[in-house]
From Swiss-Prot:
PROSITE patterns: ENOYL_COA_HYDRATASE. This is 1,4-dihydroxy-2-naphthoyl-CoA synthase. Keywords: Lyase, Menaquinone biosynthesis. GO terms for biological process: menaquinone biosynthetic process. Its cofactor is hydrogencarbonate. Converts o-succinylbenzoyl-CoA (OSB-CoA) to 1,4-dihydroxy-2-naphthoyl-CoA (DHNA-CoA). GO terms for molecular function: 1,4-dihydroxy-2-naphthoyl-CoA synthase activity; bicarbonate binding. Residues 250-271 are annotated as: Disordered. Residues 250-263 have a biased composition (Basic and acidic residues). SUPFAM superfamilies: ClpP/crotonase. Substrate binds at residues 71-75, 83, 115-119, 141, 147, 244, 259. The gene is menB. It comes from Bacillus subtilis (strain 168). Pfam families: ECH_1. It comes from the Bacteria.
């Protein structure tokens, strides 16, 4: 078993690391890991830290226990206009979390056991990969409880499973077992519950062996197809970052600092 080390301490999540892998766990098993604005704020903080940590190459998102990955927003704190935290301001800050997961230039893996329902289902959708236990259950509940996700939860879901299936998932609010999810391309693999973490770590370790720059650009390219100009901006930012590491870019910088004309003729013009 992996020996996870606590990276930071939070009230409603766990944030741990192990051999280049960060694991962020929603720690509210008593409510099937439903999230509050505080839960989401803590996840955003942990994801941002994992993004900035150069020792972390892959991030895992999980739920405490084996009964639920995440059951979505905690309906007990849902108020007028959003979910209400200690500051009494209604929020839908999970949208910020979804976007953060998409733009982090590292693979994010959903490790799903039990229920991935509602907003929890959308969280696994926006992750790059999903490893599911054989007890996993997937589905949307929005139209049953007066809610919906008209962003990644529907549009990107349709890219994954097709428009007809995505409409079925949302219009009927049925639940699907792990094998059904695998058959529709909603998850990457299904393993026995007792092997879930072991298999997830195996996938993470395989990715850690790959070029981090290649993975960064591949993620940006995959997302650019669905994220419009914001996706292109992310891809362009990654390209600029890579360009800054070249001798050609350094020549432009240094010539400005040295108040001389840059010598770009020394660099090849590839076809």
């Amino acid at each position: 078993m992996a020996e996870w080390k606590t990276k930071r301490t939070y009230d409603e999540i766990l944030y741990e690391t192990y051999n280049g892998i960060a694991k962020i766990t929603i720690n509210r098993p008593e409510v099937h890991n439903a999230f509050t604005p505080k839960t989401v704020a803590e996840m955003i903080d942990a994801f941002a830290d994992a993004r900035d940590d150069q020792n972390v190459g892959v991030i895992v998102l999980a739920g405490a226990g084996d009964k639920a990955f995440c059951s979505g927003g905690d309906q007990k704190v849902r108020g007028h206009g959003g979910y209400v935290g200690d500051d009494q301001i209604p929020r839908l800050n999970v949208l910020d979390l979804q976007r953060l997961i998409r733009v982090i230039p590292k693979p994010v893996v959903a490790m799903v056991s039990g229920y991935a329902i509602g907003g929890g289902h959308v969280l696994h959708i926006v992750c790059d990969l999903t490893i599911a236990a054989d007890n996993a259950i997937f589905g949307q509940t929005g139209p049953k409880v007066g809610s919906f996700d008209a962003g990644y939860g529907s549009g990107y879901l349709a890219r994954i499973v097709g428009h007809k299936k995505a409409r079925e998932i949302w219009y009927l609010c049925r639940q699907y077992n792990a094998q059904e999810a695998l058959d529709m391309g909603l998850v990457n693999t299904v393993v026995p519950l007792e092997q879930l973490e072991e298999e997830t770590i195996k996938w993470c370790e395989e990715m850690l062996e790959k070029s981090p720059t290649a993975l960064r650009f591949l993620k940006a390219a995959f997302n650019a197809d669905t994220d419009g100009l914001a996706g292109i901006q992310q891809f362009a930012g990654d390209a600029t970052l890579l360009y800054y590491t070249t001798d050609e870019a350094k020549e432009g910088r240094d010539s400005f600092k040295e108040k001389r004309k840059p010598d770009f003729g020394q660099f090849p013009r590839f076809p």
